[in-house]
From Swiss-Prot:
The active site is at D319, E503. The lineage of its organism: Bacteria, Pseudomonadati, Pseudomonadota, Gammaproteobacteria, Enterobacterales. The gene is treA. It comes from Salmonella paratyphi C (strain RKS4594). HAMAP family: Peripl_trehalase. Belongs to the glycosyl hydrolase 37 family. This is Periplasmic trehalase. Provides the cells with the ability to utilize trehalose at high osmolarity by splitting it into glucose molecules that can subsequently be taken up by the phosphotransferase-mediated uptake system.
Length: 570
């Protein structure tokens, strides 16, 4: 007779083998066509790979209202052992999946609700939030999806418990305005660390975000830090700027006209531009059930294709928007990877210009000239391929149909923001934005009502700032004032009623948070805080700063951009 302890050991070994097989099968079924960087043994695996069938079953059981909850849960022991245990128990009578999860995982804690002191002005409220939103994760538990960072950082707030790439730049604008240059330096250091560790800045510091980046604002961050530290900041982060550029341009050397590789595109005339791309083609762990349902709703397309386009939209920061869809009412028609975004290419133009400046600061004039030439080539490609001459605004290019898209979105302001627009075209964009996107509460993201959060009637703080500063770059101060004043009034009215700043706003009126999307409205909120402080400086004179939005609209903006216009604006 076999002793019970040996029998249990044999059974456990069999279960582990089954668990391993199941994990590999799960990986194969979801990732067969993916060029997955997380397959590298040095790269931590996301929870859907670590936990295989268990992850799929928990998410499909909808144990938690937010799918991000289990994606952020920490296994209490080796995931393979947990998975083996699960395979042994799951078919037993009375098995309780929620109890199993509670025993084997540490779930993320709900953040304590911040109650601000009574009677605070808008500025006082924001200044009081910085320590509330600051986190430190120098050390994380084994198997945690959270990735460690060497310095403290400011999170957006709400369900967003980690650092996010493009959010952080607008948060950093506010930190700098508040005099927290130490926090700005810490966050730039964290992003530099991520570039060194992973070859790029992921969407956020989670394992499940490693397969894509976000709008590339690292150059802006370094330029911001250089305002305080001078050219030393440019020289210090030149290697990381170069690595990020290499990530976005990977594969360009071998491309023939009409070909694409990951994030880079070569058009038929040889112009080189970029697109958003995710290295995986699986459901997103933080939105697992939603992505599976989206793919099932369009059986005429391969599910893996839809998954990659959903992930690539997350990389764009605009998740989700009619901008990426053939049918704005049907998310499964999303095709992000066949669209060349105007805002992404404007940001990469800025990266090239910053690389030129940093190379010059480091004494490498030859490299500086090379990067300037690349920036000039991109600027010409933007003017050639991302300008809709019929409509009179900048737009995205459609690779599938080989033509410029007609839709006007707030992304049209990005060439103005980076000083890459021709002067006459900037004036046309200003007129179009005023006529089609400007609403009582700020600038709408698009004019389409799709139910997605990056569409009408929502307006987002970063896009308000891009618009206001871009319009000022070209002397469109009246429209810039309208965007600034209307959005600030919206923020102030919402704060007066609810005592909080939120992630997005309904700009069809004032005093209402935005809706739509995959999750409830979040408060905090990092980038809204930063943009609000900067906009308060725009409408109030330096000698008499304001702590809240004035009741009377100022006659003109008080501050002007400090950027040096590029040759395109001369």
């Amino acid at each position: 007779m076999i002793p019970p302890e040996i029998r249990r050991s044999v059974l456990l070994q069999k279960a582990i083998k089954l668990a391993l097989a199941g994990t590999l099968l799960t990986f194969a079924s979801f990732s067969a066509t993916a060029a997955d960087p997380s397959s590298d043994t040095e790269t931590p695996q996301p929870p859907d790979i670590l936990l295989g069938a268990l992850f799929n079953d928990v998410q499909n059981a909808k144990l938690f209202p937010d799918q991000k909850t289990f994606a952020d849960a920490i296994p209490n022991s080796d995931p393979l052992m947990i998975l083996a245990d699960y395979r042994m128990q799951r078919n037993q009578s009375g098995f309780d999946l929620r109890h199993f999860v509670d025993v084997n995982f540490t779930l993320p804690k709900a953040g304590e609700k911040y109650v601000p002191p009574a009677g605070q002005s808008l500025r006082e409220h924001i200044d009081g939030l910085w320590p509330v939103l600051t986190r430190s994760t120098k050390n994380v538990k084994k198997w945690d999806s959270l990735l460690p960072l060497p310095e403290s950082y400011v999170v957006p707030g709400g369900r967003f418990r980690e650092i996010y790439y493009w959010d952080s730049y607008f948060t950093m604008l506010g930190l700098a305005e508040s005099g927290h240059w130490d926090k700005v330096a810490d966050m730039v250091a964290n992003f530099g660390y991520e570039i060194d560790a992973w070859g790029h800045i992921p969407n956020g510091n989670r394992t499940y975000y490693l397969s894509h980046s976000q709008p590339p604002f690292f150059a802006f961050m370094v330029e911001l830090l250089a305002q305080h530290e001078g050219d030393d900041a440019l020289k210090e982060y030149l290697p990381q700027l170069q690595k990020e550029y290499a990530y976005w341009m990977e594969g360009v050397e071998t491309l023939q006209p009409g070909q694409q590789n990951q994030r880079v595109v070569k058009l038929e005339d040889g112009s080189v531009l970029n697109r958003y791309w995710d290295d995986r083609d699986t459901p997103r762990p933080e939105s697992w059930v939603e992505d599976i349902a989206t793919a099932k709703s369009n059986p005429n397309r391969p599910a893996t294709e839809i998954y990659r386009d959903l992930r690539s939209a997350a990389a764009s920061g605009w998740d989700f928007s009619s901008r990426w869809m053939d049918n704005p009412q049907q998310l499964s028609t999303i095709r992000t990877t066949t669209i060349v975004p105007v805002d992404l290419n404007a940001l990469l133009y800025q990266l090239e210009k910053t690389l030129a400046r940093a190379s010059a600061a480091a004494g490498d004039r030859a490299k500086a000239s090379q990067y300037d030439a690349l920036a000039n080539a991109r600027q010409k490609a933007i003017e050639m391929h991302l300008w809709n001459n019929k409509e009179g605004w900048y737009a995205d290019y459609d690779l599938q149909n080989n033509k410029i898209r007609d839709q006007l979105t707030a992304a049209a302001l990005f060439p103005l923001y980076v000083n890459a627009a021709a002067k006459d075209r900037a004036a046309k964009v200003a007129a179009a934005a005023q006529a089609h996107l400007l609403q009582p509460g700020g600038l709408a993201t698009t004019s389409v009502k799709s139910g997605q959060q990056w569409d009408a009637p929502n307006g987002w703080a970063p896009l308000q700032w891009v618009a206001a500063e871009g319009l000022q770059n070209y002397g469109q101060d009246d429209v810039a004032m309208e965007v600034t004043w209307r959005f600030l009034t919206n923020v102030q009215h919402t704060y007066d009623r609810e005592k909080k700043l939120v992630e997005k706003y309904d700009v069809s009126s004032t005093g209402t948070g935005g809706g739509g999307g995959e999750y409830p409205l979040q408060d905090g909120f990092g980038w809204t805080n930063g943009v609000t402080l900067k906009m308060l400086d725009l409408i109030c004179p330096q000698e008499k700063p304001c702590d809240s939005v004035p009741s009377t609209r100022p006659a003109s903006l008080s501050a002007t951009p400090t950027k040096t216009p590029s040759a395109a604006t001369q």
